[in-house]
């Protein structure tokens, strides 16, 4: 079997196509989760912590270059200038994104698994008794009904 033919069979299998669709949808879904965290959750967390903005929390590790034109308090400005920064606030935001995404995927998988379970059917009727048992019952009934 040629390499091209084997690859074609592999690529056109249902699982590979499902995976491709999942990756595309996951990329789009990731954008939604990022927006939820950045625009909805982090402002509430910031409000609860007294206006703390996690996305701009960092520790500067390197010197600021003399040609730097920006705010030394801005994470993005320092990063753009090539200053080494330890951006723990950005990491916290990404971690929250991951946890939300993982939880939503968990719920989706759980829902799909529940759909895959066969419906609980009513108990099936017992199988009919074998012919020899039926014959023995007939004999028993005829003996009961016959005079002695």
From Swiss-Prot:
InterPro entries: Mechanosensitive_channel_CS, MS_channel, MSC/AndL, MscL_channel
Keywords, alphabetical: Cell inner membrane, Cell membrane, Ion channel, Ion transport, Membrane, Transmembrane, Transmembrane helix, Transport
Keyword NAD belongs to the record: no
Keyword rRNA-binding: no
Membrane topology according to the record: Multi-pass membrane protein
Signal peptide: none
Gene3D superfamilies reported for this sequence: Large-conductance mechanosensitive channel, MscL, domain 1
GO cellular component: plasma membrane
Localization, UniProt: Cell inner membrane
GO terms for MF: mechanosensitive monoatomic ion channel activity
SUPFAM superfamilies: Gated mechanosensitive channel
Annotated transmembrane regions: 16-36, 89-109
Binding partners and assembly: Homopentamer.
Main function: Channel that opens in response to stretch forces in the membrane lipid bilayer. May participate in the regulation of osmotic pressure changes within the cell.
Family the UniProt entry places it in: Belongs to the MscL family.
UniProt name for this protein: Large-conductance mechanosensitive channel
Protein source organism: Paraburkholderia phytofirmans (strain DSM 17436 / LMG 22146 / PsJN) (Burkholderia phytofirmans)
């Amino acid at each position: 079997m040629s390499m091209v033919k084997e690859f074609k069979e592999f690529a056109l299998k249902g699982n590979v196509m499902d995976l491709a669709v999942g990756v595309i949808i996951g990329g789009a879904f990731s954008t939604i989760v990022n927006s939820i965290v950045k625009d909805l959750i982090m402002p509430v967390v910031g409000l609860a912590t007294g206006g703390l903005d996690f996305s701009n929390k960092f520790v500067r590790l390197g010197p600021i270059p003399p040609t730097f034109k920006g705010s030394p308090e801005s994470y993005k400005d320092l990063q753009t200038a090539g200053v080494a920064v330890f951006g723990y606030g950005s990491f916290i935001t990404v971690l929250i994104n991951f946890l939300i995404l993982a939880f939503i995927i968990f719920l989706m998988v759980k829902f799909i698994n529940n759909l895959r379970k066969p419906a609980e059917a009513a108990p099936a009727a017992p199988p009919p008794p074998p012919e020899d048992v039926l014959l023995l019952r007939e004999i028993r009934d005829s003996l009961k009904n016959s005079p002695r």
